Regions:
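N-terminal secretory signal peptides and thylakoid transit peptides that target proteins
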Residues: 2-23
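C-terminal segment of classical bacterial N-terminal signal peptides
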Residues: 27-32
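Boundary at the C-terminal end of the N-terminal hydrophobic targeting segment
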Residues: 35-36, 41
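Active-site beta->alpha loop and helix N-cap motifs at the rims of alpha/beta catalytic domains
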Residues: 41, 54-55, 60-177
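Structural preference for beta-strand elements that scaffold enzyme active sites
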Residues: 46-48, 80, 115-117, 141-142, ...
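Short helix-capping segments at alpha-helix termini
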Residues: 108-114, 138-139, 168-170, 191-194, ...
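Catalytic alpha/beta core domains of metabolic enzymes, predominantly
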Residues: 178-282
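Structured C-terminal cap/extension of enzyme domains
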Residues: 233-350
């Protein structure tokens, strides 16, 4: 079982005050009409990559490259775009960068096909609510949030997601990690009208989807993570989508589209090609994802940030591989990625 990535604790009194406000919101008539149910809403189904965050040579957020990443995803025929989450180095981003980046993504995405999902987790519940309201204001199609803390109990998780889900009418994705099991997710489903989507990275998602669908009368829609390694098995079992990384999302999207067109052999062949990139990414870590975007002309640089944004303690680990961890992209790794990209060029859309 995976360990939950710690965020920060919040002031409980302030949290309960905010929860009271959100509870009032849930009583407003019409609250249960979700954005996804309104005419013209983009479908929340398919390949929704968690985007990498580009930085300039001076380590500033590169908005132009971030906008180009949205366009790159659209050109690849990909179904959605998610930012910022763990793979986006979100704990290194300042509040101003989060707000500015979300607005740029939503504005660009409004004219394109992919649905835009904005990550709203933060060092406390008040800022998470602020991010959620901002996402709704700038026109995002949905929001997603990690849980509040490594050591939070199910009641605290439930209260947190009630507050975040009650802050807007946007559909809410809950990112299930650590020990967030089926019972807690079903309790959330019953208590939070906007919660209808799970990115499941807790325990064994392949084993959880059956009970989640059955106990929610198939109203909870399940997405996967973990680089989409089990995508074929997930589609067989009725997953509604996957949230892999962005650099080769066009390959995942082709796998998804082929499978749902009934071309299962072709889908499995395409997924086999995608696995070439997946193994390289796992071997060489998050910098390799940015390097592929650099090779594909989306990013101008591919370095990672190593400093946390204000509000996060030094005890909080950044993304896997980005905090002086086990993986490193060396020259041999770069050569391997270049050769893999060259081999797969005939299959790339973007």
């Amino acid at each position: 079982m995976r360990t939950r990535k710690p965020l920060e604790d919040w002031d409980r009194r302030a949290f309960l005050q905010l929860l009271g406000v959100s509870a009032l919101g849930l009583a407003v008539p019409g609250w249960k009409i979700l954005a996804a149910e309104r005419a013209g809403a983009k479908p929340l189904r398919g390949i929704f990559p968690v985007a990498q965050t580009p930085f300039t040579e001076s380590n500033k957020l590169d908005l132009d490259a971030l906008i180009e990443e949205v366009r790159f995803i659209d050109r690849g025929g990909v179904h959605g775009f998610v930012w910022p989450q763990m793979a986006s180095e979100w704990m290194t981003l300042t509040e101003a960068e989060r707000l500015e980046g979300s607005e740029a993504i939503a504005s660009t995405g409004r004219k394109l096909r992919p649905a835009i999902v904005i990550g709203v987790q933060g060092p406390d519940v008040a800022i998470a609510i602020k991010y959620a309201k901002h996402a709704e204001r700038v026109g995002a199609d949905a929001i997603i949030s990690l849980p509040p803390s490594e050591n939070s109990d199910p009641k605290t998780d439930l209260e947190y997601y009630k507050a975040v889900g009650g802050a807007t009418q946007l559909p809410l994705f809950v990112q299930a990690v650590g020990n967030m099991g089926v019972d807690l997710l079903i309790e959330m489903y019953k208590a939070i009208p906007t919660f209808r989507y799970v990115k499941d990275e807790a325990g064994s998602p392949l084993m959880s989807i059956g009970p989640l669908r059955q106990r929610s009368s198939d109203q909870l829609k399940i997405f996967s993570g973990s680089h989409g390694r089990d995508l074929i098995d997930e589609m067989r079992r009725g997953f509604s989508g996957s949230m892999p990384a962005a650099p080769f999302a066009d390959l995942y999207a082709q796998t998804w589209d082929l499978w749902h067109e009934g071309k299962h052999d072709e889908a499995m062949a395409m997924h086999g090609r995608t696995l070439l990139f997946i193994t390289e990414a796992v071997s060489h870590g998050p910098e390799s994802l940015k390097y592929i975007l650099y090779l594909r002309g989306v990013f101008k640089t591919y370095g990672l940030r190593t400093q946390r944004a204000p509000g996060f303690s030094s005890a909080v680990k950044l993304a896997a591989g980005s905090d002086q961890a086990e993986t490193h992209l060396d020259e041999e790794g770069k050569q391997a990625l270049r050769e893999t990209l060259e081999y797969l060029k005939p299959y790339l859309r973007a």
